[in-house]
Amino acid sequence: MSAIWGIVDLSAAQSEAQRKNRAGNLWEEALRMRQAYRTSCLDRIQEKREATYYLACGVQDVTREAVEERFPYERKGERRSLFVADVILDNRRELVQRFGSRWDLCSHPDGEILYESFCSHPEETLAVARGAYACAYLEPGKRTLTLFNDAVGNRSVYYFQEEKRVYFSTLLAGITCERENWKENTGWFDRFYTIRDLRAVSEPRETPYAGILRLAPGEIVVFTEEGVHRRDYWDPFAGRKILRGKTEVGYRELVTTVFRHCVEDVIREGRGGKETGILLSGGLDSNAVAAYAAPYLAARGKKLYSFTAVPEEKERARIPGQYAVEDERSSVELVRRFHGNLEPEYLVTNRGDLLAENRRLREVLEVPCKAVLNLPWMYESYR
């Protein structure tokens, strides 16, 4: 995935000296924010700066279309707007058919499709768009900045406002770099330690830093000179209904059809013909996904590359009945018998000091985490 960051000054007109001073400060802050992304695995940075704003996107070319992204996208004229997004869409064609002004958008990158859709039909786009995305939409003439993300929060963005200036960033470091001392959000830490399960937070908008917030799943936040307006644009229970009158076979067909579409829609051709991978265990969750993904790829002459964590030999040699790390090789090999295009890779990770691993991975996650058991091998797989 990519990353977005920026600074927007929403203050009204001032004296020429004040405007120059604020513009100079904004540029200094923009340079610090950009520096926070110097170690990120980005293919390129696309950015634009004027006196009252700085918008940037660090693009990763993870799909074939991503190579053509040209952030920030911009419409000129009376309704001038600019747009940056960290986005991978699952229903590109549907958005183009419904809201696109040009059919040739089907071959264009995800960011451009989402921008064109949102410009012409903002509310409908929020209701229809599927995928993983976090976006910033700026209307300079109105001095309005809109942040929004996908309905289930696959992606998010942090934000902070001070003196009518809004800072947003995919990485926390993009905001925390702007000052040396931040107050702790003691409520966040209190809840982190008192929740007696693997949930790290109970309030999705809060962060360990006082004043820095993040988009909740399915949220749109609008910043104007007058204030901040937040709302949830998606409710999973709104409009639900009971499907009656179907046979057992009919219900089964409905479920499998929806599941198949969900799996197939997220499979995208990578840049340079890169292949598709999956984190695969011996359980039903990941195997259900593999059961649809493998045949879909096989029909196109492609393989499905799986990654599975397995214990070291000393872990496997423990006495039966005692605590041990499960070795799921046999389960994966059984699945491989059914899907000839499955290419498994087994990752042996040292689980001896998970606390040390957690400290190392906290630099990646940027916030404390509880569920440390799976993080080392997942991190190695993603690398």
List where the protein language model places each region.
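Conserved donor sugar-nucleotide recognition element shared by glycan-biosynthetic enzymes
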Residues: E328, L354, N374, M378
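Cysteine-centered catalytic environments shared across enzyme families
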Residues: M1-N350, R359-V364
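A conserved catalytic-core signature of glycosyltransferases
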Residues: V84-A85, A371-P376, E380
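Long, Lys/Arg- and hydrophobic-enriched amphipathic alpha-helices
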Residues: L365-A371
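Active-site adenylate/phosphate-handling loop in enzymes that bind or generate adenylated species
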Residues: A151, L354-R359, Y379-R383
